[in-house]
């Protein structure tokens, strides 16, 4: 079972601080800014970004959560049986700049599904994508606005993000095709 740690806890902390600064630099009018985390690991990442922005600028940015599982294009797959989670967007996204947050950007299909789900909640001024890891292999024309780390990988390798809130520790691993789930 071959696995390699790509980012440790301190790397993730620094990376999220950098992304928060990039979000602030790009969005001077931060009163129009909201952050929405994609289930599962995008949710704690969204909360951490909002905490960083609060610490750096004293700005409290609204944070929501988005379950996009019913918008996926593989619902008819024999292998996929979604666990429905609670979408919680307790604010209007109309005319807001929505920063959509996910842990890994791979084919772009989850991002497409999340954008479809998000549009059911209103008409944002803009949608920006923040990801901890971009591993390439796009199948759809999707790119992230904020990238923690580009990790070129083989298609059969897996990127595993572990976060304290969901997994008890912070790290990003790359697993070969024989390593399976950790």
Swiss-Prot record:
It holds the Pfam family Pribosyltran. The keyword Transcription regulation applies. It catalyses: UMP + diphosphate = 5-phospho-alpha-D-ribose 1-diphosphate + uracil. Keywords: Glycosyltransferase, Transcription, Transcription regulation, Transferase. The keyword Transcription regulation applies. GO terms for molecular function: uracil phosphoribosyltransferase activity. A motif (PRPP-binding) lies at residues 98-110. Gene3D superfamilies: 3.40.50.2020. GO terms for biological process: regulation of DNA-templated transcription. Its EC number is 2.4.2.9. PANTHER family: BIFUNCTIONAL PROTEIN PYRR. Regulates the transcription of the pyrimidine nucleotide (pyr) operon in response to exogenous pyrimidines. Also displays a weak uracil phosphoribosyltransferase activity which is not physiologically significant. Belongs to the purine/pyrimidine phosphoribosyltransferase family. PyrR subfamily. This is Bifunctional protein PyrR. It comes from Dehalococcoides mccartyi (strain ATCC BAA-2100 / JCM 16839 / KCTC 5957 / BAV1). The gene is pyrR.
């Amino acid at each position: 079972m071959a696995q390699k740690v790509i980012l440790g806890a301190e790397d993730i902390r620094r990376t999220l601080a950098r992304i928060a600064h990039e979000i602030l630099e790009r969005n001077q009018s931060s009163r129009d800014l909201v952050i929405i985390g994609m289930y599962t690991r995008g949710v704690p990442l969204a909360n951490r970004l909002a905490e960083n922005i609060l610490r750096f600028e004293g700005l409290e940015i609204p944070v929501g959560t988005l379950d996009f599982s019913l918008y996926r294009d593989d619902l008819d797959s024999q292998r996929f049986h979604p666990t429905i989670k609670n979408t919680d967007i307790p604010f209007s996204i109309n005319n807001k700049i929505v920063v959509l947050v996910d842990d890994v950007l791979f084919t772009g299909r989850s991002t497409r599904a999340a954008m479809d789900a998000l549009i059911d909640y209103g008409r944002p001024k803009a949608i920006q994508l923040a990801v901890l890891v971009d591993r390439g292999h796009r199948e759809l024309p999707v790119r992230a606005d904020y990238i923690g780390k580009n990790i070129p990988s083989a298609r059969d390798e897996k990127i595993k993000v572990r976060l304290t809130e969901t997994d008890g520790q912070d790290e990003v691993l790359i697993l070969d095709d024989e390593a399976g789930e950790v």
